[in-house]
């Protein structure tokens, strides 16, 4: 099992000391990756429902570091950590510029980028960015992935599509990773599974939250759907990685009850949950250890590394 953790893009830890401190500490502890989320602006009036909160409200009030800039900084401050966008909202940015930025970070990090992608949920943010039509975001995202793969190939290349066009161009340097950095798709909807099956190298859903529990039986059913879809596209279904993002709730004593949410409870229960999802095919788990202070955050990382990660890495 490989383990990653969330870097702060907002709040009191979203500083140079906070981001770099967490990244370097995690690398020393043996974590394999860091993730960072993507928002550019938060309009003052948002009616769109955040899909991972029971009340539909997103926790940010507008503070959000730009994710690719943040990961470029972390690339220079670390040597081994994989750098994962979790997730990059594809329609928010020009696809040619995005391809160039991702390739540049991959070159400077010596091949450590994983591009986690999503289609977005906040209509108001799309409008503020003058992004493509929110209701076409799925089709736009699919086309942008195709553009990325072209631009990450030896040129010249061109693209004549529904949502974007360009004539013959070269876009170099190419990414270090060939044929391209791994692409993981976030989300657990049918369109997200289809997008993963057709285009991606990994499935990267959030789980163990009230609106997306993804308990073992549900996760297994979605995994099976994904693999059937992949076969339908002529792909090896087992070539698609399963990278789960559960919410973590640690307690000093075991949590009782049949309705206990996975990754809630004592160290022994967390270890059991790791093994359960490993048996389902999950090879990467990412957690959010952020606390009120950097000291408390690093202590949480220490605890998990010694009490759970060290006992489940094999």
For the regions a protein language model found, what residue spans apply to each?
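Active-site-adjacent structural elements that line small-molecule/cofactor binding pockets in enzymes
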Residues: 1-314
